[in-house]
Amino acid sequence: MSSSFFNPSFAFSSHFDPDGAPLSELSWSSSLAVVAVSFSGIFTVVILMLACLCCKKGGIGFKEFENAEGDEYVADFSEQGSPAAAAQTGPDVYVLPLTEVSLPMAKQPGRSVQLLKSTDLGRHSLLYLKEIGHGWFGKVFLGEVHSGVSGTQVVVKELKVSASVQEQMQFLEEAQPYRALQHSNLLQCLAQCAEVTPYLLVMEFCPLGDLKGYLRSCRVTESMAPDPLTLQRMACEVACGVLHLHRHNYVHSDLALRNCLLTADLTVKVGDYGLSHCKYREDYLVTADQLWVPLRWIAPELVDEVHGNLLVVDQTKSSNVWSLGVTIWELFELGAQPYPQHSDRQVLAYAVREQQLKLPKPQLQLALSDRWYEVMQFCWLQPEQRPTAEEVHLLLSYLCAKGTTELEEEFERRWRSLRPGGSTGLGSGSAAPAAATAASAELTAASSFPLLERFTSDGFHVDSDDVLTVTETSHGLNFEYKWEAGCGAEEYPPSGAASSPGSAARLQELCAPDSSPPGVVPVLSAHSPSVGSEYFIRLEGAVPAAGHDPDCAGCAPSPQAVTDQDNNSEESTVASLAMEPLLGHAPPTEGLWGPCDHHSHRRQGSPCPSRSPSPGTPMLPAEDIDWGVATFCPPFFDDPLGASPSGSPGAQPSPSDEEPEEGKVGLAAQCGHWSSNMSANNNSASRDPESWDPGYVSSFTDSYRDDCSSLEQTPRASPEVGHLLSQEDPRDFLPGLVAVSPGQEPSRPFNLLPLCPAKGLAPAACLITSPWTEGAVGGAENPIVEPKLAQEAEGSAEPQLPLPSVPSPSCEGASLPSEEASAPDILPASPTPAAGSWVTVPEPAPTLESSGSSLGQEAPSSEDEDTTEATSGVFTDLSSDGPHTEKSGIVPALRSLQKQVGTPDSLDSLDIPSSASDGGCEVLSPSAAGPPGGQPRAVDSGYDTENYESPEFVLKEAHESSEPEAFGEPASEGESPGPDPLLSVSLGGLSKKSPYRDSAYFSDLDAESEPTFGPEKHSGIQDSQKEQDLRSPPSPGHQSVQAFPRSAVSSEVLSPPQQSEEPLPEVPRPEPLGAQGPVGVQPVPGPSHSKCFPLTSVPLISEGSGTEPQGPSGQLSGRAQQGQMGNPSTPRSPLCLALPGHPGALEGRPEEDEDTEDSEESDEELRCYSVQEPSEDSEEEPPAVPVVVAESQSARNLRSLLKMPSLLSEAFCDDLERKKKAVSFFDDVTVYLFDQESPTRETGEPFPSTKESLPTFLEGGPSSPSATGLPLRAGHSPDSSAPEPGSRFEWDGDFPLVPGKAALVTELDPADPVLAAPPTPAAPFSRFTVSPTPASRFSITHISDSDAQSVGGPAAGAGGRYTEA
């Protein structure tokens, strides 16, 4: 039994015996016991398990986070999605982002709140730290949100418990936009707790508090105050936040600085915590009805007073814009209360009800401060006239970008480069590897201030070869040019034209050397302002368009670039509007004659000629409509400022080059004139490029095509007639665009064509060209050419462009078409070629006629008037003023240059031209000296902001009036045909500059000033043009003008006696460069054409027969003539320099005689230019402020700007071209000193004084030339090109400009570049640019103006197209 009990089977079998018999009852009882025990054990286990489970569940309820990975979280994850799931599953994951983001307090709260929100953040997550204030709704607390391990500070707005339902709704509605919208400039509402009372709003925390309080605290400690750039950025951010609200149909109920918060990283967020009523009680007027009215910020239309009670309506988008303007004002006043001197009642009465009280301009010194204030004023217009928040934001963004560009790139680099040593940039520049030249060129083109870049380690790339150091002294600005051969000399050996070999080469490369227009002309130009013979240092302007030659970009593209960039800011457009005109010279660097650049041409005399036509052709065709711009851009800039130097030298590389150059020049001149007309809104007379472009464009284009970078070459090669034209081109204001016509022609079409035809300037340029060509073709001694030039300039703004075509026949006396085709080749041989190279002779002749007629008809119109005024003024003044007129004539050329160049600084430059016109700008002084109406008008028209900051405004007026005069005068005055034709070109340049004035301000001025000159001379010129056009082959004057680059120049130079009646005395100003002999720059006293950069083309003429040896270089272009200046009898005629006419052109033509009256007038004017020699002008120029003061005529170069001797033979020029080591400033080179934007900040005031001083120069004999050269440039500052008698930039040595033949070979003899060298004493501008062309832009001011105009309007119209920046 015992065993059975222990046997496992016993329990079951024990009941039965082995036999199956039942066991004893005991076994049954034991079995039941076992079963009972078993069940009880099971139940116990189950119960225990249940108890354990229950206990566990209870624990979870109290410790939910322990179960974070449980089913609940899984469900949450599925509901919230992966991001939320991740956040929930990993409190760690959730916490980590918060922890990482905790550093930027401003943004962290937003993120943390969002994360908290995703995890259903509630009031239980909030930890109140302290109370920070109270509002109408209740209290405001600083709190902290804990999410896992991390915590984020937030602001909690708590609605009082006693709030009514209406207040509850208002409380929640106020936060709606901040909850719905997420933007970097809008305050973020992180959470809303409205399930129970009290209602809570969780807002992101901005540690620096409201912007008003921050600025006020900074004002106490000045060292802590934000810099102007930061304030500008803040203004843009405020506008951006408001714009975002408006885009989503929200309006701000109380927009003011106090309701803008500042994060730890100084980011502005529109929004508030409701503490304004408590913190800034004084900012509100509390009515009897307990209405809190922000009286000083509220728009007048929202407030009304009835029976002494204020009625306030809800805010609108328009009223928000008003408040935005006040907020920006408040920002720049560092939190000052608007109308601080007036009580609330006075503000209500005078500011709100009567709207007689306006906020003054903020005292804070800002870049483009006038433009900023202008935007504020836009915000305070009537509701229907106010801009939208989007428009305001666009304007502010543009200004901000421009300001940033100028301050960072231009201002700092400029200052480093302007330091007494100026070696800072130099070193860095030389350090730049040549291999990186192309890339650096592109970068430079993209940057606002390519030249400055070269000077600084950051951005000077290869262009750092040339460094111009400008030091401001009690006597003005001291310029010291230093050239480093290491950087780009070898890299770009195209044509010694480029100031810096590297830059020139780069430009050349960019320009598609040899066969097609350079595509990246702007880059090279920008970096090496000297394209070919025109090298300019541009410290300010930035390349408007990366695709354009920097110089061109500086010129023609500048406005456009600005527009295109509008703004890429500055660069700016904003690119560098300011600088773009300056860069306009750069295209010449490419070399109008050579695919590479003017350097090549100068160095390779032969390539230049063949290329000259070729580049011109491709360029022109590519930008048929833009052709004028592209063409005129570099040439115009080069010629007007240092056209002669740039153009002549560049154009003079070889006789062959001269021809093409002439053609290019003529074309450029025409183009430039057209552009000028376009820019001058009132110059409707000018026809569109097509009208004057038929054969002309074709020929020009062909020429350009022939010259790889014809446009660039043109600026160099032809007087650069191309420069003049480009400068006059509306785009000329964006000279860079035009200058790089070969590469940019496609991009510039709209600007160039439209502007050229529309503007009087274009006619003026054409005019100038025609008269010049006429003079050149008609005969060196035939005054008819000059009158014709004047007539054309005045009478046919549009015909001007056609004029080139006409001149082709006229110059050659052969069919225009053939001339046009062969003009480049012929030009060297005779004046006709110069014209021929300009345009297809056949079409141009008719075009010229039609141009003349249309010009005559339209000149009175606003646009034409610009051109006409400038042109006629130039001629009229010249003829009337005699010697004075000579200088005056030159001054107009300079003036035209200024017009081209100036946008913002143009005002100064305009004033200076005005002064120059009055005499200050002796070179183009005819308008100033004789009838200052054109120039003064330019100065007067448009307000200072526009003038100072808008290249369009200043240049257009100034250049227009001055340029036409300049062109006319040199032709008239300068005995040598070269100078006179240069004058014509100058006139064209003026027109080109007009485009800068094209801005609203410019247009008016142009219209007014143009009429002064235009009406008188208009008919005569028109008639002459028509006659010449009709007999295009015979018409020397007309043909010369069209082919004027050489023909006209030659004519002028060759016939100094007839042309230089009174001016001749001054003409004799010897200019070492001018004398540089082999070039055969006629020592013709040529009307200090060097003064007139546009005159640069004239050097071409010199090649023709003339008083001075034209054959050598036919480079009467500024440089050649200035070189002639070395020859006592060869006063540089800036205008002549501008026009690179062939010697053949010089030869007197019957047509020229027919136009004798006008021609004589023009001749006198031209003579005036000739008389005024860059050296003298520069030396004598006493313009207040930064005027380049040449110690002597020979010192025309800004101090040491002229490195090369005055006398430069073609061989020497060519040698220089090859070496590219010697840098010379030519007449075409101009230093623009702009007080406003430049470091010296003397833009506005100095300019006027410059004007005054300029007149003195005009009248003054020796210093006159320098003054004339710079006066026109007056706006352009002392550095105007060619401070020395040779008026060569130091680049001259590098570029054949000095020889003039290298670059201007086609235009003039190697000596011609010297003529171009006449240092145009730049008007005292704080900022400066050295550019061979007068069409340089003012980098800062110009950009500013451009930007402002782009933003504000006027500038945008012309030079200010942002284009800029």
Swiss-Prot record:
Its main location: membrane. Residues 1150-1164 have a biased composition (Acidic residues). It comes from the Eukaryota. It holds the Pfam family PK_Tyr_Ser-Thr. GO terms for molecular function: ATP binding; protein serine kinase activity; protein serine/threonine kinase activity; protein tyrosine kinase activity. It catalyses: L-seryl-[protein] + ATP = O-phospho-L-seryl-[protein] + ADP + H(+); L-threonyl-[protein] + ATP = O-phospho-L-threonyl-[protein] + ADP + H(+). Gene3D superfamilies: Phosphorylase Kinase, domain 1 (3.30.200.20), Transferase(Phosphotransferase) domain 1 (1.10.510.10). It is found in: Membrane; Cytoplasm; Cytoplasm, Perinuclear region; Cell projection, Dendrite. The modification Phosphothreonine is found at residue 1156. The modification Phosphoserine is found at residues 500, 1035, 1159, 1162, 1175, 1178, 1253. Residues 550-623, 638-698, 791-1186, 1237-1293, 1343-1365 are annotated as: Disordered. Expressed in brain, and, to a lower extent, in kidney, heart, lung and skeletal muscle. In the brain, expressed in the olfactory bulb, cerebellum, striatum, hippocampal formation, thalamus, hypothalamus, and pontine nuclei (at protein level). Autophosphorylated. Phosphorylated by CDK5. The active site is at 254 (proton acceptor). Residues 1015-1030 have a biased composition (Basic and acidic residues). Interacts with CDK5. This is Serine/threonine-protein kinase LMTK1.
